[in-house]
Structure formats: structure tokens, C-alpha cells
Amino acid sequence: SAASDVYKRQVVGNCNSQTAPYGVELPQEARCWSDVLKDMDYRTGYIGKWHLDSPYKPYVDTYNNHGKVAWNEWCPPERRHGFEHWIAYGTYDYHLKPMYWNATAPRDSFYYVNQWGPAYEADRAIEYIQAQKESKQPFALVVSMNPPHTGYELVPDRYKALYKDMDVEALCANRPDIPAKGTEMGNYFRNNIRNYYAC
């Protein structure tokens, strides 16, 4: 069945979890749609975030690999499932100064940019698409932007301004899925929703 195939492939959830174990990464031998396209002579590109590999020691020296849990990891080319153009990272939530590995970078050669992650990724995607115009070869591009994600406040002020007057309580009215004001999660929602929308 489809369900047993999912678990055979070790996919145990479709969202991040603080209780998810390492060892559930997408297996290198799993055949993905990107592998199929690459085999059919597509040019393939991936830009953005992808929790593709689990961190391993010595951890990549980024802020989110210090402490109890390491999050960020480089993905070697043979594990990228056919994606040849690569501007990506495992996870990095400083959205106003993100970091990336390009297609040929070794594990210790990531770089930072002084631009909001989604804007940088959109610019790189536009460049990639424009570079394909003269080719008769088909292409596929995935752009996986991190925000909206914690560090909700890490969004350019011009986008925050669009939501500064949003009536948060009106948004919460008649919504049983939003926790009550005064509760931990209710307050978290109310404190972050404007920036979430700004992302």
C-alpha cells in the first residue's frame, strides 16, 4: 500500500518535530521526481532550505549547531537527487543574513549574504530561469523559501509596515483553533502574527 511504502522509505512525518529522530533522511537510493527529470536530460536546480541530511560531528560551525540539538548540514552532490544547480542549506533561521552552499562548495565553504533570504533566493531563481532561455533543454527549478518560520521578526521593515495596523483580535475572533489570549501559545500567536504575515 502507499502508506506502507511511505514508512518503508522512513518518512515518519511531514513537519518538523522536536522528537523526530535522526536517521530519517531521504535515502540516497530513493528515486525522486528530480532523479527522473535528470535522467530525462532536464537541467535541474534547487534554491533554498532543505533538511536533506542530518548533522554529524564535527558540526558545521553555524549558530544553530551549538547546544543540545544540531540542525544545519551540508549535502554532498551525490545525495542531491539529481539537482545540479544548488544554492541551499539544511536550516538557518537568521533570515536577514542567511547562509548557503553552492553546487561545488565543500562542507566548510558556505557563505553568508546581507539580504533577506526570500529576496536573495528569488533573485537567484530569476537568474537561473533567464540563463535557460537560450537552451532547448527543458529545466526544473525548486525554490524553497524558509520564511515564514521562527525568527518571524527577521523580515524587512517595509513588509512589517504593511501589517502594523492589523487587528489581531479580529483575526482571532470565532477561531477555535487559535488559543486564548493569556495562554502561552495564544500570546505567542498574537505577538508574532503580524510578522508572520509580513514574511
Name these PLM-found stretches.
Residues 11-19, 61-68, 103-108, 163:
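Short glycine/proline- and charge-enriched loop/turn segments
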Residues 56-83, 147-172:
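Aromatic- and acidic-residue-enriched segments that line the glycan-binding/catalytic groove
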Residues 28, 32, 36-39, 120, ...:
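Extracytoplasmic/secreted proteins, especially bacterial periplasmic and envelope-associated proteins
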Residues 30, 79-80, 118, 122, ...:
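A structural signal for well-ordered alpha-helical scaffolds and beta->alpha junctions
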Residues 1-47, 52-61, 91, 98:
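Active-site segment of extracytoplasmic enzymes that catalyze sulfate/phosphate-ester chemistry
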Residues 1, 91-119, 126-199:
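Active-site-proximal cap/lid insertion segments
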Residues 40-45, 81-84, 135-141:
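Loop/turn elements at helix/coil->beta-strand transitions in domains of secreted/extracellular proteins
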